[in-house]
Amino acid sequence: MLTVTCASLSGGQGKTTTALFLGRSLAARGKRVLMIDADPQSSLSFYLGCELSSEQATLLEVLKKEVDVVDSLWNLDDRLALIPADDALDSAQDFLATSGMGAIVLRRRLSPLQDQFDFCVIDAPPQRSQLCMTSVGAADQLLIPAEASSKGLNSLLRTLDLVAEMSEVEAFQGQILGILPFRDRWLGRTQAKQSQKSLESMQEVAAGHPILPSILESEQFKKAIDQGVSLAALGYADLEYPFRTILEKLGC
């Protein structure tokens, strides 16, 4: 199982959008995919239609080792499963902080699933927190979505700093798959000046890491999420190009 974490240290950077469409794209290619909602806001769980019952285990119980990880899986279909989250996940912060190995806890908890799935896609929270660090620490490949704006540039810089710090102490042993510009705005065939300037700045600070094709600003993403369908099903297959590029980089 190859684990891909979507992480960026600010809200509104496209982490959940990226995780959702990447996971579905991998499953559509016939891959067995585990998705993990590591954000207490639990947007990924909501978008995937997960309605938690009192008996359903979540990522919180997995991290605390209160349940076997296989018993936490919410099977969406034959190829797609989810470890969900809810507000209670925030209480895992103290556990991870006092565990002495918070950054590698999730990596260890997932080890029994190595042969059950081809890919794991993790939606990390936007804060520089224990939950974020254990999500990054679990990654073989890291995707950094960043809005094509000054806020997105700052988020990218902060995320790269975190990765560098974790790499120095070997808490992150994976690779950066790429930086994924989000909400790249175009007016017809002309890129908005703010987007153009932001992408140029991202290129300058990327430290040699690849800048992937942008997720364009479009209401069709919200429609696809709300309807639980692909962009291609809505007639906008061209908007899936960034994800096709990611799949190619992952060997799919």
Curated annotation (Swiss-Prot):
Induction: Transcription is reproducibly circadian, under control of RpaA. InterPro entries: AAA_dom, DNA_Partitioning_ATPase, P-loop_NTPase. Signal peptide: none annotated. One of its GO terms (biological process) is carbon fixation. It is an enzyme of class 3 (hydrolase). The record marks 151 as: McdA subfamily signature lysine residue. Changing residue 11 to V: McdA does not associate with nucleoid, no longer oscillates in the cell, Cbs aggregate and abut the nucleoid, cells elongate, McdA probably does not dimerize. ATP 1 binds at residues 11-12, 14-17, 41, 182, 216-218. Changing residue 15 to R: Locks Cbs on the nucleoid which are partially aggregated and enriched mid-cell, still nucleoid-bound when mcdB is deleted, might bind better to McdB, cells elongate but grow slower. It comes from the Bacteria. It catalyses: ATP + H2O = ADP + phosphate + H(+). It is found in: Cytoplasm; Cytoplasm, Nucleoid. Changing residue 151 to S: Most McdA is diffuse in cytoplasm, a small amount is associated with irregularly spaced Cb aggregates which abut nucleoids, cells elongate. Restores McdA association with carboxysomes (Cb) and their positioning, cells do not elongate. The keyword DNA-binding applies. Its main location: cytoplasm. Belongs to the ParA family. McdA subfamily. McdA and McdB together mediate carboxysome (Cb) spacing, size, ultrastructure and probably inheritance in the cell. Together they prevent Cb aggregation. McdA is an ATPase that forms dynamic gradients on the nucleoid in response to adapter protein McdB, which associates with carboxysomes. The interplay between McdA gradients on the nucleoid and McdB-bound carboxysomes result in the equal spacing of Cbs along the cell length. Binds nucleoid DNA in an ATP-dependent manner; neither ADP nor ATP-gamma-S support DNA binding. Mutagenesis studies (characterized in vivo) suggest ATP binding, protein dimerization and a conformational change are necessary for nucleoid DNA-binding and binding to McdB-bound Cbs, which tethers Cbs to the nucleoid. Eventual McdB-stimulated ATP hydrolysis causes de-dimerization of McdA which no longer binds the nucleoid and releases McdB and Cbs. McdB-bound Cbs then move to a region of higher McdA concentration, distributing Cbs across the nucleoid. Self-associates (probably a homodimer), interacts with McdB probably via the C-terminus of both proteins. Shows no signs of filament formation. Homodimerizes in the presence of ATP, making extra nucleotide contacts than with ADP or AMP-PNP. Each subunit binds 1 ATP molecule; Glu-147, Lys-151 and Arg-183 cross the dimer interface to contact ATP in the other subunit, while Phe-182, Arg-183 and Phe-221 stack with the adenine base in their own subunit. This is Maintenance of carboxysome distribution protein A. It comes from Synechococcus elongatus (strain ATCC 33912 / PCC 7942 / FACHB-805) (Anacystis nidulans R2). The gene is mcdA.
